[in-house]
Structures are given as structure tokens and as C-alpha cells.
């Protein structure tokens, strides 16, 4: 396409979207402070998509002729291709992504036609819309990564249906559980993260485009048409002031991402502990571990440690954004230039972390013999004695005391609960007949916990099936 009034892309004079009321340009330090292309340039494809939709509503409102519509859209297509290829880039004097792209459009269609695109829109409604568009796409990408992590955990659960380990509270041995049950517990929290992100998307699927600076447009434009073209399922926002000024969608996304980071950090912390020589639960695959520059024997769980560290970064991004948003009056304020970087960073960190977490978790080697050895340690079957007594009609208060006395006796002679003699059991409580031994094994304990959600093998198999089905449903949403 022939360049008009500006030569090659990137060589025209920088464009300001304001200035008629000013006798001089901004001071150098002022311009430097205002610059945002170093982080908002990623919004360029969304800005151009918005400009295409805006061009069409300008034509429908009679503000562009059919010929102008065709030439404007052609110019935007060329600009989009040049942005994608890198042929067009912002220059130092471009204040933001909007300014840079207007300069690029003027270079391609000329100032007379290109200048008409600004009618009926403001950077305020533009950036609020573009940010939503970018973030909705980013959330879908993050969601896919979370589901990959869930798939890795589910695959490990399927590969170890009978493996047992000591379940813990306060990091102390509590009750034996299936390894699959434990891994699927992490799946549940991660799937809630996905549900939160989907709920967030439903609230964010409204377009501020057409809100103008704050009061809406007087030019007969159709915000609903723009919303439909840009993929906003909810249509246009109901209040133009709210549309340009509100960033709760960004804060909510930052929370969802921070909560996801916290949940990932819990998985990561367990891998770090399990990988120690003292625990010896797992061995990391070489591809997902690192060594030491001085200690040849080291095999470090860096993926898990970075997950733990980055979770704090995500929480920091959330709190920083909330502090920025606090007490801003309606409508738009320049403080909102600071709304994007924390969210951009959170997404970037998860884009890096999620594939690594899925890879690390999916390739863990579990030492099931070690897990089975430790499962009954620490008197983890004590609760089974108490509940067995309850099933014999003994009040739980009494049963709890009797079970505690069994622990005391076993501990005193360095034995396990299953090693107490029949006479020792009967002396503790007359209802402790030899039949209690059916729950004094790890397998018996686990099999007895067959209520919904419990650790019995049949219940855990059901849980895994539901997780797999839930993941499939979320992937169907992503595909749609």
C-alpha cells in the first residue's frame, strides 16, 4: 500500500493525541514519566482490532463513506501485519500504544482519513477495553496451563492407585491415606482456581468501548456492535463512567492468579520436603532439577523452589495493584497507568511456571515402598481404634481416651499398635476384642474410610473420574 504523508513506517513525526490547548510541549521529564510503550505495546493487536470495529460503527453512523471505510480497514490491515512482523515499532516519542498506532495509521492512510478514526472514542475507553481483551486471552492461556498441571497429578494418581503414605496434620503423622487421594486433593484446589478464572471471565466480558472519556458518545455510535465484534459476550457496559474508571476486573484477576500461585506453592513445598533424604518419598527427573556449582552430589528442586518464590511475587502484585486503586475518585485518573504492569507480570510468571510444574510433577518417581513403610508410623491407626470402639457402642469421649491409652502402652515398650497383645487391648477397654485387629492394618484403615470423599480405594477412583470429567469440561470451554 502506498505510504502517504509520512514515508516509511516508523519515520513520521510522533503524534500526540492532545495539545491544542497547550502553547508548548511537555517537559522532557514529564514526557519520560508518561511513557508506557515499554509495557503496553503488547496491547497493539487488540488496539487494532478495536480500531477495526470502531471504523465500522463510524461508517454505520454516517461518519465515514464506503470508500473511506474500505481504505481505513485496508490501512489497519497493513498496520496489523507490520506490527506482527516487527516492521512497525513504537519510537521513543510515542507516549503509549495508542499514540504509536495512530502514527502508524496516519503513515499508511494519510492524516485526513486517519484523523477521522479518533471521533467518538478516548484513550480512556480504549485502554479499558484492550486491557480486558488481553487479560481474557491471557486467563485462557493460564487456565490451559493449570489443567496441564492437574493432568500431571491425575496421571500420577492413576499410576499409583494402591500406594499409601502417612497423611499429615501439623506436618505430623496423622492417618494413613492413599497417595492418589493426596494428589487429587491438590487437583481440587487447582480446579477451584480454574472455576474462579471462569467466573471472572463472565464478569469481565463487557466492553467499555464507546464510553468515551467518561460520558459516552453523542455521534450515534453503537457500542453493542463493537462489543459483539470484539468478542464481549455480555455486550457493552451499562454505565460509561464505570466502564472507563473501574479496574476491579484487573484486581480480581490479580487475586485469582495470586491464589493460584499460593496453591501451586503448597504442591511445591511438599515436593521440596518429599525430595529430602530424610523423607525420601520422591526422586526428581534430571530434566526438572539442577545441580550445584560446588557440590557435585546435589540435585536441587529448583522448579518447586521457584514456584514457592514466585507465589510471593504474585501476592505482591495483587497488593500493589490494590494500593494503586484505593481511594481513586471517579472517573479515569492517570494512576491507572500503573494498573497493567502488575497483572502483566503475574501472567508472565505463570506462563513460565505452569509448564515447568506440569513437567516436574508428571515425571516424579514415587518410592512407594518407603511410603508404605512410613504409613503406620507415628501411631497413625489410633483413630481407627477409637472409631472401632464407637461402632461397638462406646461413647467417643471414652473411645478417644482408650485409644490414647493404647498409644501410651505401645509407645512405652517401643511397639506398634498392631503389636499390642489381646490382653493388653482388653485391659485397656473390655470392648477391645481381637476383632479390632481388622482395622489395625494400613489397608484395613484405608478400606474403612469409604464415605464420600474418603480415602477408600473405590472412593478415590470416583474422585479421579470426577476430576478427569471436570478437566474435560474446562477444556471444552477453552475450545469454545
From Swiss-Prot:
Broad EC category: lyase
Cellular component GO terms, alphabetical: cytosol
Positions of region (Disordered): 1-20
Keywords, alphabetical: Amino-acid biosynthesis, Arginine biosynthesis, Cytoplasm, Lyase
Cellular location(s): Cytoplasm
Gene3D superfamilies per record: Fumarase/aspartase (C-terminal domain), Fumarase/aspartase (Central domain), Fumarase/aspartase (N-terminal domain)
Pathway the protein takes part in: Amino-acid biosynthesis; L-arginine biosynthesis; L-arginine from L-ornithine and carbamoyl phosphate: step 3/3
Gene Ontology biological process terms, A to Z: arginine biosynthetic process via ornithine; L-arginine biosynthetic process
CDD domains: Argininosuccinate_lyase
E.C. number(s) listed in UniProt: 4.3.2.1
GO molecular function, one term: argininosuccinate lyase activity
Main location: cytoplasm
Catalysis: reaction(s): 2-(N(omega)-L-arginino)succinate = fumarate + L-arginine
Family the UniProt entry places it in: Belongs to the lyase 1 family. Argininosuccinate lyase subfamily.
Name recorded for this polypeptide: Argininosuccinate lyase
Organism encoding this protein: Saccharopolyspora erythraea (strain ATCC 11635 / DSM 40517 / JCM 4748 / NBRC 13426 / NCIMB 8594 / NRRL 2338)
